A protein has these predicted regions:
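Helix-loop-beta segment of a Rossmann-like dinucleotide-binding subdomain
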Residues: 70-86, 164-175
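N-terminal FAD cofactor-binding segment of flavoenzymes
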Residues: 31-72
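Glycine-rich FAD pyrophosphate-binding loop
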Residues: 4-8, 18-40
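N-terminal Rossmann-fold NAD(P) dinucleotide-binding loop
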Residues: 12-13
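Short beta-strand to alpha-helix junction loop
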Residues: 42-46, 77-94, 177-182
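FAD/FMN-dependent oxidoreductases across multiple families
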Residues: 79, 99, 179-249, 253-254
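C-terminal helical "tail/cap" subdomain of flavin- and related membrane-associated enzymes
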Residues: 251-323
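Predominantly flavin-linked oxidoreductase catalytic cores and closely associated redox partners
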Residues: 8, 94-200, 213, 229
Length: 323
């Protein structure tokens, strides 16, 4: 079987590396980047389970960990967790570098994998069921002192501060309701409050928050990672899901059961649709107590360890911000 992969992010490179190791004929096609860090999306946060997946690629994950924290501050409240802040550009280079930048001919491949994320370049044949996107903007800054990991709820989203070592941070925000200029101003005000020594770089982008978009297999085109809608709406976490879905797809290609990949993704990530529905309610300022169980699952997947009181606190903050 000959496999073409379009998109050289986490999902695309992970799939490429596994299939090459297993002896498949596989080509990886990259996309032109417009950011200083040469990645999109510009994310650095993940969790212990995801770090373990990195180890399965024959890569030493600890070499790419910038910092590890056992808590995060959410609207001023300290919540326990096991969180990793990674050097994503360096990790991507370690996973795969043999990348083509010409346009693939679909007829050259038995399977063409769309790993293009928000763009879904080759997935027009796949129904885009109730798609949902949020706008985000972010700055990488150098600070005078220690920075704590933090999230602060805003209307339709949140502001974040992600440590990249001891004196550097990724500071940004995103919303599914506010216009991009409003998000940019909130983030810029947040950055100014931190009084950074230097703003290293800045960028804006969209992120898919639709939940899984099925089917993920249509003829010879297959979606993976964000292209398949596999992003956790709470926190817009997509690194873990990108690794995991790529590994699942690699196993199904190896077993010659490509059609079984759709069922496997539904079984593993179907719960993300429930999280999407909760976020739809959040936008209206409505967060049911019945949603706490699903919210807990999402936060645990992202590396947090919230108590019931933590969940109730977050629920109240979401309702207040989205009145």
């Amino acid at each position: 079987m000959r496999v073409g992969i379009v998109g050289d992010g986490i999902a695309g490179r992970t799939l490429y590396r596994i299939l090459k190791i297993r002896g498949f004929q596989v080509d990886l096609y990259g996309q032109e980047k417009y950011t200083r860090c040469d990645i999109r999306p510009c994310g650095f946060a993940t969790d212990a389970s995801c770090i373990n997946l990195v180890g399965k690629l024959g890569v030493s994950p600890q070499e790419y960990v910038l910092r590890r924290d056992n808590y995060i501050i959410v609207n001023g409240r300290r919540i326990k967790g096991d969180l990793y802040w990674i050097d994503k550009p360096k990790l991507l280079e370690a996973i795969a570098t043999d990348i083509r930048y010409d346009k693939p001919d679909i007829d050259d491949y038995d399977v063409l994998v769309d790993a293009t994320g928000i763009a879904r370049v080759y997935s027009s044949v796949i129904p885009d069921f109730n798609d949902k996107k949020g706008i985000s903007c972010q700055h990488r800054v150098i600070l005078n002192g220690y920075v704590a990991p933090a999230f602060d709820v805003i209307r339709g989203g949140y502001l974040w501060t992600i440590p990249l070592g001891e004196r550097e941070a990724h500071v940004g925000g995103g919303s599914t309701i506010l216009p991009s200029n409003a998000v940019q101003q909130l983030v810029l005000d947040h950055v100014k409050e931190m009084k950074p020594n230097e703003i290293v770089c800045s960028c804006s982008e969209s992120v898919r928050l639709s939940g899984p978009i099925f089917p993920v297999v249509s003829d010879k085109v297959i979606t993976v990672g964000e292209s398949a809608g596999l992003v956790v709406s709470f926190g817009a976490a997509g690194i873990h899901t990108a690794f995991e879905s790529a590994i699942i797809l690699a196993d199904h290609i190896y077993e010659g059961d490509v059609t079984g990949y759709d069922k496997a993704i539904r079984r593993r990530f179907g719960w993300l649709r429930g999280i999407r529905k909760i976020w739809d309610s959040v936008e209206k300022g409505q967060v049911s107590l019945l949603s706490l169980g699903a919210s807990y699952r999402a936060l645990r997947y992202e590396g947090l360890k919230p108590t019931l009181m933590d969940l109730l606190y977050i629920r109240k903050a979401l309702i207040e911000a989205n009145k």
